[in-house]
Amino acid sequence: MADGLPSSETSAALGNLVSGVGAVAFVGEQLYGVEAGAGCSHGLAGTDNTVFRVNSDGTTTEVADLSAFIKTHPVANPNADDFEPDGTWYSMVAVRGDLYAVEPNHGEVDRIDPRTGAISRLVDVSASQGHIVPTALAYHGNFFLGNLGLFPVKVGSAKVLKLNPSGALHLWTSDLTTVLGVAFDGHDRMYVLESMTASGFPGPGELGTGQVVRVDPNGQQTVIAGGLSFPTAITIGPDGALYVSNLGFGGPIPGLGEIVRITIPG
């Protein structure tokens, strides 16, 4: 579809984590992406993290400059010890013609109008929640926002918040760990992707600890799939199955990333 987009990599001491395109979303038949690894603070002078449109010939067109927006619209409670000026954008969804993107490092959800490039803040998560590292965004009548949390991993410290269109946050479900994805099925059941569920820092000890938790409308949680390693995203396909990007980071050797299909149990 498109290549040659900016990407960056952390040092080996931090795990050689690569940031490129953080997420994609469709408005009708038009594909959009959000960059996560661009900007001077990622080591790429002369670039910015943007929302871009993918053209039919494989080229891309900038729609909105997210780096510029967050530098001029600071959140209430940034974490000075863990601050990324350009942000590291993670999730993006399309709702009624607009795009909504999550920035975990600052802690915010922003609305982008793909027709005009206008950016506005839906919610400053840091203002009420502090530095919880929001990552996963899904829309199911309202927005639902999951968080990664801080390292070292503390089991049960993550949650999913309900976010209404006016920007108000309410706790939806808790006692989760390192949430990196949220999806819904046709029965109003939520599926939460936990990337790691062992205490400590990302490393060999976390291999195989990723899992998918189903949250029923009554709040009951059930693990429906386990044995995943550093999964990074989840979606439901047209066949009703879950699709998870497994080994999205942190694998023992490069090139092990895969998409796995999970049949939803009745």
Sequence positions of predicted segments:
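Beta-rich, blade/repeat-based domains predominating
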Residues: 8-31, 35, 70-99, 128-143, ...
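Blade-level signature of beta-propeller repeat domains, shared across WD40, Kelch, NHL, RCC1
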Residues: 232-266
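A short loop-to-beta-strand structural motif that recurs across blades of beta-propeller domains
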Residues: 49-52, 108-111, 158-161, 210-213, ...
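Short loop/turn segments that connect beta-strands within beta-propeller blades
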Residues: 54-59, 113-117, 163-168, 215-220, ...
